[in-house]
Structures are given as C-alpha cells and as structure tokens.
C-alpha cells in the first residue's frame, strides 16, 4: 500500500459519502474513510516519510483536478477557484474507526470553498457554498 501511495501517477480519492457529524442526522454507521481518507493519507505520508508534503498535497488536489479536467481547481494560481484546506502537518490525522466511524479528523484548522470560509478552527461556519463540479 505504501509503495502505491508513493507513486506520483496515482491520486488519492474516496467513494465515501458526505455524512453529517450530527448523529441525529447520520443514522447509519458509514465507513470510517467517509470522515478520514485524506487526513489518513497525510498522516501515513508523514509517519512513513513517503514524499515531500507538497507532493502529497498535489496528489490530493492538483492531480485529481487534472485527471477530471477541472482546469480552475486543484492549484493555487490567479483565476483559479479558492478551495483551500489549512491544516497542521504535524497534527493532521484521521480519528474514525469501525467501532466509531463518525469522528472529525484532527489538525484541520480552516476550509475555504470558493473563497468562503466553511470551517474555522475546526468548527463549521454554517456556510453552504460549493456545488457539483463538471468538466469544462
């Protein structure tokens, strides 16, 4: 698994669904990766020193956007859509387990979608920006 993760031609993805952390809404036990795929990848990269952090971030952002033909996503440059996750590289980790899958990851400070803050200090702002992405 670690060898495959290290291949720069392979991006990271998940078939997990978008569930709420609110157990009154999420009345099922989703797979733990629905809440932790990307933090888990970053944790494994850090712990096993698989690649530089910027390469790991590219495998989560720029490479999938390129593969999907999303030319205005996945990279920070003028004219691109500002979808940004600010995280502590030493603290980021997945916390979900099969026995308790609805758990927030640690180490994520801010999330911006389309330039709008949707997560601040690990807490949702209630912003509902974003939408379905289509190849252009």
Indicate where each model-derived feature is located.
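His/Asp/Glu-enriched, well-ordered alpha-helical/loop segment
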Residues: 3-89
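Glycine-rich loops and low-complexity Gly/Arg-rich segments
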Residues: 36-39, 109-113, 135-136
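Long, low-complexity intrinsically disordered regions
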Residues: 128-136
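Context-gated lysine
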Residues: 33, 59, 103-104, 134-135
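C-terminal cap of metal-dependent C-N hydrolases
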Residues: 2-9, 14-15, 85-129
